[in-house]
Amino acid sequence: CGDGDMQEGVTYEAASLAGHLSLGKLIVLYDANKVTLDGPLSMSFSENVKKRYEACNWQVLEVKDGNDINEIHKAIKKGKKEQFKPTLIIVNTVIGFGSANQGTNKVHGAPLGKEDGKNAKLSYGFDHDEFYVPEEVYEDFKKKTIKRGKSKFNKWNKLFNEYKEQYPTEAKQLEDAIAGKYSLNIDELLKNYPVGHNDATRNTSLEVIQEVAKQNPTFLSGTADLASSTKTKIKDEDDFSVENYNGRNLVFGIREFAMVAIMNGMTLHKGVKVSAGGFL
């Protein structure tokens, strides 16, 4: 994320909830270049981001030089070791590094121009006028990134095949969930609600939610501190919490914006179906 993201309300909502839920696998890299489109960040933002995230129960690491790849790598490795807190890595960078206008808003949303682009490349020791990717970069990518990906993929497949042998039913459920395959039949239930049915829609919704939850074990429901009003709670199921990540009721707190963003992310990731309710 960048300096602009740190000013958005949804960022705080999501960070607060992630810290509360001790999401230790979450690592965020913050590109701190202290420049926004209209000028220096100091015009509109003076918070101590490190202290804010520490207050939200995050581990906060800092890389002094954003051009030092090894330091970034070390910080990510340290972030992976932390199991009980999300990690924010503040990476201090210079926007437009190598350009004549580096460190200013002039390189925020505008092209460098041919001459300045050429000079920026020369400052890196890269003597090419046009866009060019050296062959050794392709080779390095194949050797490190693709080979590493294949190795991890094969290792995961081996582990999953062993899991399938030991837990065939659960493995099938997982495969179906990832593929978005599930059976759902609420035709009989819907017969209870003919046109003109005289009841609050949230009461009807509550009954439908219970039936969907019964038929689909990957279905989760949540709300922004309004479960008693919007009637979104799955009965006889626990809340999702630090103590119980198996809970099917998502407690977002009064964080409506983050609730919607998180649900979008969960849906795109696949493996679960989610719903939530709120007030407009």
Feature map (PLM): residue ranges:
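Glycine-rich ThDP/TPP pyrophosphate-binding loop and its adjacent helix/strand module
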Residues: 1-144
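Thiamine diphosphate
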Residues: 143-146, 150-280
